[in-house]
Amino acid sequence: MKPTSKASEPATPAPPQVGASPQQAKVPSNPSSAAAPVAPNPDLDRAKDIAGRITSKYPGSKLEWVKPRRLKVSVPLGIIKDVAFFARDSLGFDHIGTVSGVDWIAKSSLEVVYFVGSTTPGQEGFVLALSESVPRDDPVVPTLIDVWRGAEYHERETHEMFGLNFQGHPDQSHLFLPEDWNDLPPLRKDYVSPGR
């Protein structure tokens, strides 16, 4: 009996040797895969559509990044509440996931980022990161509690940790820090931990 030939199957390349140079470690590419059409991705298309609706309605807004079911849009100072109502009422982002801050010390600004989600049919699991930057020396943003009620404790924590002041928030007292804390907010980049 003759052994059967597997000539029609491509040979599997040997794994690269430990310590091999990048040139030696390259796996030969399959030329036929380079020409393969990219499969449509409705989740990515929907995320791009959402971003386009925000950036066309609010000039100066910028799409920071987009992935399937995930996108980040930054908005100009002073319009985040308008954009938030639009995201909720027209785009189906019906609940808040969390709120965070980013200290851009080199730019002398603080960024507030709202991560909002959707349970709208056809858009379940989508997350919009909606952000606005404010000056570090005047870190005031409007509260979005009237847009998403669940923002209350998230804004409170972000106020405590970054020093962002949420105008109109009913209670910005400490959640985690001692009541008599009088140092910089601990997640600011210029905060120095005692003993360091």
Predicted segments, located by residue:
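Terminal low-complexity/charged segments
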Residues: M1-R196
